[in-house]
Amino acid sequence: MKSTDTTGDSSLRLELNVPNCVTALRVVLAAIIGYLLYQREPGALFAAGILLIVAASTDTLDGILSRRLGQETPGGALFDLVADELLFMPSLILAIVAGLFARTDGLMPLNPYLYAVPALAGGVSVLAGVAVFLRKRRTRVFDFPSPPPVAKANYWFWMAPLIVAVLGVGPDSFLAVLMYLALISTILTFYAYLKKGSYVFTD
């Protein structure tokens, strides 16, 4: 467990700055995307797919801005993690309910759950980790584990099949390959987080 002092950068206060505003935009877009996916109409699904690309891109943009503007904060990092899951998890569930992964039936066993269940479990684990961290930090100060390199790529491995399924583009086999790659990436990311950040749950 890494301990830090209680001053300066260790504060979890969510500051009103440009990167956090970009992250907040992702949360707003997540709500709009959820509404569009719920409609299940071709035009709404196309708009949802485009907005998914835009919203997912803000995950990269807010990170770049926070580094270049010198506005990296622990609170902003946690907000970014939560915003990622607020975008991905409801969108994936609504896409499954809408039958957008049905075209890979026969190409993936237990379609689409072999892809979806581990991905959703990963998202739940992240949110649980944030909740436990915030609870424990009331009595002592320690760092939340920074995402391992594989986790940064993993988010796009999660999003790629979702975007392709929502837009309905590409061959069915291409979507299936993306889903298998997402499964592999999820397993590797879970192991990396378990190895690096298990102290959040155990200490």
Where do the model's predicted regions map?
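Short hydrophobic/aromatic, small-residue-rich stretches within specific transmembrane helices
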Residues: A48-A56
